[in-house]
Amino acid sequence: AGRLLSEDEQFDCYAAVAEAFKGRPLNIRLADMGGDKAAQFLSIPREDNPVLGYRGARLLLGQPDLVLCQARAIARTSTITPVQVIYPMIADAQQFYTLRGMFRQAIEGMDHGEIRHGVMFEVPSACVCAREMLKVADFGSIGSNDLIQYLFAVDRDNDLVAGDYTPDKAAFWRVLGMIAEASKETGKPVSLCGEMGGQTEYIPKLLEIGVNSVSVSPRIISLARLTAKSRLSAIGS
């Protein structure tokens, strides 16, 4: 749109989707701008390395009006169906505390339904502290695209190092295992999203380590369910 959508415009977009969910939880990520998702209308100064700069949680903390507007639209949406709010690019628990506090303050006095608050695991520092993060969050979501990029210090858009941008590395699965273990210990669910979620060959291993929810594109939902069912049957036998 070339501009920030108003509260009413955001609500109209969310409500159209919420109506289709019929009481099932709707995941909505807070504005994840900056880096590879630059928004010109925010007038952010040019950065030499935007992927490591003013983006995600840092941008939201510096642009509170973004949180205010979106939070109010989300609160209105939650009267239609439960909403799970995902906080992007969280580096430590303090960022999550602060942003969640800003969200709650923004909707104070509003009528709203069930709203749950979750951490996006895509910055390695958050993954290392997964247990502490999940103790205070309602759920977690693993952002595989950025996590791979930051974990291996590889630019996913650079053809020269494209070979290093892969989930097929032991260190990556060790980190996923840490998050899954923290999920079990705290009783907080963890899901996975990103390009990896669309590659069904990873579903069995994800189920094995304890990640039992994966975001996939509509065209492969049936295949993903079949793969998961097959793996769960094998585990149960």
Kindly label every feature range from the protein language model:
Residues 1-237:
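Conserved alpha/beta-domain cores
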